[in-house]
Amino acid sequence: MAGSSFTLPSTGSAPLDMMLIDDSDLLQLGLQQVFSKRYTETPQSRYKLTRRASPDVSSGEGNVHALAFIYVNAETLQMIKNARSLTEANGVKDLVAIDVPPFRNDFSRALLLQVINLLGNNRNADDDLSHFIAVALPNSARSKILTTAPFEGSLSENFRGFPITREGNVACEVLAYGNNLMPKACSDSFPTVDLLYDYGKFFESCAADGRIGYFPEGVTKPKVAIIGAGFSGLVAASELLHAGVDDVTVYEASDRLGGKLWSHGFKSAPNVIAEMGAMRFPRSESCLFFYLKKHGLDSVGLFPNPGSVDTALFYRGRQYIWKAGEEPPELFRRVHHGWRAFLQDGYLHDGVMLASPLAIVDALNLGHLQQAHGFWQSWLTYFERESFSSGIEKMFLGNHPPGGEQWNSLDDLDLFKALGIGSGGFGPVFESGFIEILRLVVNGYEDNVRLSYEGISELPHRIASQVINGRSIRERTIHVQVEQIDREEDKINIKIKGGKVEVYDRVLVTSGFANIEMRHLLTSSNAFFHADVSHAIGNSHMTGASKLFLLTNEKFWLQHHLPSCILTTGVAKAVYCLDYDPRDPSGKGLVLISYTWEDDSHKLLAVPDKRERFASLQRDIGRAFPDFAKHLTPADGNYDDNIVQHDWLTDPHAGGAFKLNRRGNDVYSERLFFQPFDVMHPADDKGLYLAGCSCSFTGGWVHGAIQTACNATCAIIYGSGHLQELIHWRHLKEGNPLAHAWKRYRYQA
């Protein structure tokens, strides 16, 4: 059956130019009047044009007409205005009219793009949706229905699309045209999807007072121990001291501060930084960038992720070059296009539209939090039991792959593993949960990624150097291993190496899971945690990761015009050329020769000697890219000082690089994240609270470390003094996480 034809009305009923209307309420009223005047003849037949749906209205002649909207860019709109019919509008492709009006303020551009792409026959981009054309067409015209998963609290919503084709034989009248007034997201930061609460905004709201809470006169201030001087522990110490706690002691088993915020400096090149831990910092990490700005460390540059810079791909014995900002080589384009289509179009699961990742990002960005909750819950419902591998197979090997092109099972999956989703090959983490990887995308952690020119460890160093109440946090830190933590009545005993015991009122633990379970012995009884929290600690998956850096005499990739990123299926996996001093192109260079995860990292543990490992990696890169590998020699021939490596799995203080949930394990993150909230229930509150990125929904990201530090700090302030609830709230800053009305998800254990 043919679609609707497209003809402009006669001169007497020319479409109304609404280009000057920039208010959604006025646009709604204007469109209502235009449609009502044209298609209703009696007052009784008038209708109200709502924001949620476009009406069907009788013309009084037995015909029922629907109001729908075509979305186009400015150029296409002008071509259609100049033509008397679609056939005269050269270059205009087949269009689709949908029943989503341009004044809907709960409908983002990304969601509109998804609906149009799924209802139409063409692929559109965001720039194609800047203008609308309002059309009336018979309700009997051929159409397609798209059903969404839960939307804005309702069970579902249906969208209707009418194909507008050159061959159509159903009249379609243009009524008006104008600017699309649907909101367009533009912020760099937004709440993370599992929380729907912006910790960055909370810290901003506290900036004027310089504290997140305080202790009223007459309230006994607690004696507090913080186990671990990673970033979470240092943030908590700083916030507690600023809130007025006088007695804070930080215990750190290693000889340095900062945990996984660890920047190695080279003696011969002090401006060159090897980030042994966290090295990629997305702009969406609002908490991190709040602290960077607060401490004068906002000098950042773009991280050279694959495709953002010239990239070499070595796959099955052949070398491919991927120019910066362009499409990847032809061999990889099917999987690249499929993934990009998934980001825009989401997935049709058994006929139900699951919101695209970009639509979820827009909902978060625009503050449509109920909508974001519904979108994310739908993905949890349908995909939480999937690994990333099985989820990708389900989508792209099935009958309705995003983008419309089905993948070949083995070859395309291998290509996708090598190419990754933005930050390099994801093959080693394919058995992680699908939701866990999707979480990275939705939280914006794969986009707009930065590096810190000063080195990220400068941030914990500056926090630790703050002098509060006459002493710095560094001076309050004891470098010793905590061996055991136990409870005695309403006090908590900390036993350190050597047998000494200190007694505290409140304890914040930021240690890794292995230390919590095997050294501190916190899960061996129910003295501190409910059984489900202990289970989460014992069963959360920590990812192994290895890095090896090389300081070179020159930035050879600039001088010889070589790719600054290499992805290989060999041992090295991912190679990055890093420039921490771009103002000096003749200065020393830094190459992250190998960054590996999981099984790829485990292989390297067989070669612990860094010189031997370097030689192996250099040979591997030489097979893939000999012109690059020949420049891989340490500056000044100094192998001892100018090659550095670290294996996070064998680090006794870490027990892994970061938490990465397996399928079905997202409930562990929920249990760990909300553990400090027990303080609001006196019968459950044991005075010990968890923090650290591994206790968040975003393991491995600084954002999660700060969020959990904030939770624990608020819990300590709230729980001190045994006051009435009303008083508790008075000495915590308004809008704090304990007072927030959390909208929890249904995670499936």
From Swiss-Prot:
The record's annotation in InterPro entries points to: Amino_oxidase (IPR002937), FAD/NAD-bd_sf (IPR036188), Flavin_monoamine_oxidase (IPR050281), Glycosidase (IPR006064), Trp_2-mOase (IPR012142)
Which positions bind substrate?
280
Entry note: cofactor? Binds 1 FMN per subunit.
Task: Provide the alphabetized UniProt keywords.
Answer: Auxin biosynthesis, Flavoprotein, FMN, Monooxygenase, Oxidoreductase, Plasmid
EC number annotated for this UniProt entry: 1.13.12.3
One GO biological-process annotation of the entry reads: auxin biosynthetic process
- Provide the cofactor list for this protein: FMN
Residue positions binding FMN = 232, 252, 260, 280
Q: What reaction does this catalyse?
A: L-tryptophan + O2 = indole-3-acetamide + CO2 + H2O
User: Record's family?
Assistant: Belongs to the tryptophan 2-monooxygenase family.
**Name of the protein in its database record:** Tryptophan 2-monooxygenase
Organism per entry: Rhizobium rhizogenes (Agrobacterium rhizogenes)
Name of the gene this protein is made from: aux1
